[in-house]
Amino acid sequence: APFLADTRVRFLEIPPEQARRGKGHVLNAGYTAVTRSELAEPNPENVVVVVFDADTRVEPHFLRAVAPYFRDPTVAGVQSAVRMYNADQKLLTLWQHLEFAVWGQVFCKAKDRLGSMTLGGNGQCVRFSALSSLGDEPWQTSSLTEDLDLSLRLLSKGWRLRFCSSVAVWQEAVPRLGALVRQRSRWLQGHVICWQHLPALLRSRLPVFARLELLLFLLLPIVFLPIGLTSIANWLHVLFSLFVGDWNYWNYDGDWDYWNTVSLLTWYVLGFGMAPLVVVAWQQIDRPPLWRLLLHSHFFVLYSFVWFAASARVYLQVLLGRHAWFKTSRREREGAGAGGVKTKRAAAALRRRRHVDQEPIQ
């Protein structure tokens, strides 16, 4: 690769038998290499480790955007926003783009304010001294979600984590439904494994609302399935009412009254509760046409069934005692690599950000 010709770049090669042991092993190998070099001397608190996936496209001003957060010595890490550069490939990849838009623009901003922000696996920036406070191998190799595990241990030790919404990393959305469900079930199972950190989190000095949010966040695997079953029952009831002619669902007797309105609003919240959040988040990052915004924000409800299926798979995996790790395949066809996939959305977003000063950070 051309960038390897830069004298500032150091290439670390890991034997295949070690690289296939999981992302945590690879990250720890990189951490060890930095520890043994002069890079972390003499001020490790001023050294920041940045983690990108292999298929990531990084916006030019990434470092300039995240660096100011580290002026606060209590900040251990910063997470950037995440976008999908193949969102235009199919409906499934667009929904993942919307999913990460809502996660970043709504939930991560809220978590940042509460003090319960957690790091992701891509676009993750961590202070070297914070990693050192976790021991010789900061990333847990036994965890299915090493990023979440790292975040919870840092928060338990009193470190702060922040979210930077002004810059994003662009990654490839998973184009196949089966691979996507497997990936999401691995994430949820990783949440279950991270329950081991709950006692330390609840005893920590984190704000009360931060601890409560983290508790609810970690319990997501067990609530997705009941919520999914409730949602399915709600939709079946509505469809039965519409096609069979049983309008009792709306309590409709010829005159529209207060309770008819309550029934309609209840159905909308249960069926399309995420739609307003999608509208807000998508409008902020892409500004799509109004018709597309309203249409896809409501069709996005179908994407929730990916999480319901993933939750059911986690129940099964836990009952069977399985904790296997599988690398998620994002390739739908040979040759559709990260460098070969270009979309109007990713290109337009990168063009909008070209005006940012790109001088190196000292």
What feature does the model see in each segment?
Residues L216-L320:
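Membrane-embedded multi-pass helical conduit in multi-pass membrane proteins
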Residues S165-A179:
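Active-site donor/metal-binding and catalytic loop motifs
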Residues L4-P44, H61-L144, S185-Q196:
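Long helical/loop segments within the catalytic core of UDP-sugar-dependent glycosyltransferases
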Residues V49:
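Short aromatic/hydrophobic "clamp" motif used to bind/position activated sugar donors
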Residues N46, A54, E146:
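Short acidic donor-binding/metal-coordinating loop in glycosyltransferase active sites
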Residues D53-R57, L154:
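The conserved acidic donor/metal-binding loop of glycosyltransferases
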Residues S151-V169:
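Catalytic donor-sugar/metal-binding loop of nucleotide-sugar-dependent glycosyltransferases
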Residues E99-Q105, V181-L201, G271-V278, R313-Y315:
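Catalytic core of nucleotide-sugar-dependent glycosyltransferases
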